[in-house]
Every structure is written in structure tokens, then in C-alpha cells.
Amino acid sequence: MMNMETRRFDKKDVKEVAELLKNGQVVAFPTDTVFGLGVIYENEEALRKLKESKGRPENKPIPTMVADVEQMKCIAQMPAEAVALADAFMPGAFTMILKKQETLPDYVTNGFPTVGIRMPDDPFVLRLIKECGKPLLVTSANRSGEETGVRDEQVLEQLDGRIDAIVLGEAKGKLASTIVDMSEIGRASCRE
């Protein structure tokens, strides 16, 4: 279906990788859990390319990765309880579902009134987000329905020629992120 050259980068190339993302490219990179597949936030065409390369259903929203609580506040409503949870558990393998800010475009959330946000516990990814100057929309770096990889070779087996670039390396391979729904204060739910 897609056939492009997937460029290879090292973690030291963070500025070049950030430029690719800012220019709407789809990039795979190791995170604190599994390999992620990301695009810059607020680029609808980049998000479409990500979903196409992954074979992801259109109606499934992509989680947002942020570098700090201030970025969270720009895209989600952050009641005091959510700020306290973020301070206690982020950065880490912890995703909060929050009510989105009215200014957040519907295509980011697939029309849902909520947004999933995570601050990864990975210095490279945090630096990458800061270099981009905006959050990233990041999902697992695999074809939908296929095994999620923690090593670059696993990702390339599925996505080589379907994505613009990959940052070589290995994810920390921790368990998937714990998800806490804080969209209705007073009623929190959790799943791992």
C-alpha cells in the first residue's frame, strides 16, 4: 500500500527528529513503555497519515503526550484533583482522561468530549516534545491488531516503508500505562 523510505535516526538527533515532526512527518521512537508512533499535535493531515500507516480505525482517538502540566492545561480542563494526580504520578506510565478544552480541535479526539494525556518518564521523549514546542499524538508503533514492539527491529518489520522515520533503540518495556478517567470529578475509574 504505502511505500516510502523510512529514515533512521539516533537519540542524539533530537533536533532533526523534532523538525520532521513539526513538518507533519510520522515518526516511531522508543518510550518508557513500548515503541511509540507519533505526530505533532494540531496537524490533521499528519494524524491521518499516522492512522493510515498503522491501519488504525478512524474512530479511535490517539493519546496525547505532553512534556509538563502546563501543556496539559492547554488541552484539557485540569481540576485540582487532576493536578494533584499529575504531580504524584507523572512523568510515568500513567494516562489521565480529562475533559478537553473547548479550543481542542475535534479531530484530535475523534469528536469525543475527553482527551487521554500522558507524560512519559523518558528523557529523550520529554526533550523531543519540548523541541517540538507542542504535545505529540502518540500510539503504539505497530500495525493495528499486531504485536507491539519494544525494539526498533520489531517496529521496522511491521512499519518499514509505511512511516517517515524511526529513532533507533529499545523501549524500556514496562507494562502499558495505567489509565485513570478523571473526566467526571467525583467519579474516577481506573484500568491497567
Locate the predicted segments by residue:
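Active-site-adjacent structural elements in enzyme catalytic cores
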Residues: 1-191
